Amino acid sequence: LAESTPASESPAESLLSYAPWFRLPEGWDEQHPVLSPNAKTEAHFLNLAERNIPLSAADGAGRAWITAVTALDSEPDEPSIRLEEGEPREKSRDDAPVATPAVQVSSLQRIELVFEVGPLGIEEGGLLYVMPEPFWSWSEVQLENPMGLGYTTALSRVEGVRLEPIADGAFFEIVGRALDPGERIDIVMGAGPSGTRVDEYAERGSEILIAVDAEGDGTRAWLEDSARLDIVAREGTQMIALGPAEVAPGDPIEITLAIVDERGNRARWPGDSTGVDNAVQNTFAIETIDGPSLIALGLDEATHLVAAVDAPYRLRFTAPASEGTIRLSIRGLHALEGFDSDVNPIVVRQSATRLIWADLHGHSQLSDGTGTPEDYFHYARDIARLDAVALTDHDHWGLRPIDQSAEIAAKILETSLRFHERDRFVTIPGYEWTSWLHGHRHVLYFEEDAPIYSAIDFATDRPDELWEALRGRPALTFAHHSAGEPVATNWFFQPDPELEPLTEITSIHGMSEAADAPLPVYGAIEGNYVRDVLIRGARLGFIGSGDSHNGHPGLAGLATAAEQSGLAGIFTATLDRPGLLDAMRARHTFATNGIRPWLSVSIDDARMGEAMPSREDEQATHRLHIRYEATAPIVGVDLIRTGRIANLEGNGALSLDLERIIPHLAPGEFHYVRIIQEGGGVAWSSPIFIDPVSTMATEAN
């Protein structure tokens, strides 16, 4: 509907012409006097309208299931999976049964389904709509070209009824007579020689969607009991070795070794089967790049590890008694010849805080992402080796909005709470406040209650109203892709200092830090970058997060050409929700575009994210200290002082320990560091802010 809105009409006028029953809430214009510079008002109006569509009881009724799946890019053109005709098997969105068909990512398939009419029937002139999940790379259903990709057919099993294809929109019209309850229709996706192409991202329970418009009046609803299949990874092509960011001297260390396919999907290990519990054994060579020797770490040059075929290997050893940085390279042998990975730098130091890695923004198949919530957390913990993660499905964006379904919202929350493990793997409940008027924000709750305040509810459809609804809760909000597309942040509403101390400056969408960032967010708007907002007086610390839609939290960039993503580095006293909340409120964070370095910046006694008093003597100077442990040779270091930049050469080093005297910082200024590595890796420290002397004195008094 949005794509067909005439350019000559305003979104409201066009929407009302399509949906005469819809009215905007009274006072809407006064409620929203200023919008995001690229606000998608048509999307907001459509969400409001769809929430109030007057459906008939027969719309969305019926059920469907898969009867056969045939791989067309392998040898025999026979059904590779033939299921029993008759009753569909029990289905669960999170626990797909063994009998669910499984197909490889990006494969060509012919998928045969049966649709059974619901208890109220379908009138003559009623419509069926067929499509795979629209997110992200299934081939589209088309009804015109039998030789083309995605060609789909529908045939009635009963006399006197035919399914007339309507090419504009992949509808089938019921022609001849009405369909009675229980009558069946055979549907084939990929009916021609080209088949249909399966999504490139693996997921359990991928849905073949069927919508029923029982009266042909233009309103339809999705079947709740529809057909599903599992999409599985191809052979592994990349090994990923990840360890903790930081440990204390003498602490135990665990490195995880995972294998993924070319699109970042969790794959299965090759190797020698142990014959026990589906486990395989492999051999790995270990080398030190720099730092303590293998002998000092108690490691051998080659080690044999055993794990389940689809689980990570775990390499365990003990940190040395002295401080320093551990750098290891791990290489597969025999069946894993050609697989290798450098481990992220592991800093050994005695400190009241430690660095942890978090991805605080991502989506599952319950909105516009990939995979079940359960698989999302499995990937975050076992493949990406995150310390903390949040699943932030959209409040009202996707096929079944969670702000309309208490059951779906409860499922997401229950799964998040179930995976939580204090001191090891912290899950933070949340959702995305998906405002097409004022910009998207994800909302995180540092407790076990996570109410959804929807961006299309009149009471909470502005940022200030969202913050008032959250006031008093242990919660934070984060603006993201704030400088450009898909919708920029409306900075007219200044970030609430209590509830929004941080902002996401990098994700799969690009970088919203500044116009001179290495890869700015697409569709960037001049003056709407985060640095512009800081210059205007806002105080925001920096994080990155993936905004993953591919089911790969923590490694969202693996499937992108530039490997662009986002991660949050957080210095916390404890690995639990209260500790993380305190650290984020204090802005003790830094952002990366997916890499895992170690970064600490201070000016005089002020740490990243903190405020420091201005000195009355304008000739006074400050001592800047930067420590950085890189994941690739350092290309350059940018010292960013309000609107000015000083560029330092990186000289290809892996470590940086720099002290530098910088000129007097005036009240209202801020200072942060941006470090660029070979291969495109970028890290940003949170700014340090300069207070007027009087402000600091008043606070002290």
For each feature predicted by the language model, list its residue ranges.
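Ser/Thr/Pro/Gly-rich, low-complexity intrinsically disordered stalk/linker tracts of secreted
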Residues: E3-Q238
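Core sequence-specific DNA-binding domains of diverse transcription factors
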Residues: P25, Q31, N38, E42, ...
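Short, solvent-exposed loop/edge segments of extracellular or virion-exposed proteins
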Residues: G86-P88, I240-E246, S602-R607
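Short, solvent-exposed loop/linker segments at the N-terminal edge
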Residues: A102-L108, G121, A245-D251, A611-A620
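Short, ordered beta-strand-loop transition motifs
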Residues: Q104-S107, R157-F171, A307-D310, S435-W436, ...
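Short polar/acidic secondary-structure junctions
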Residues: L120, R177, E246, E629-T631
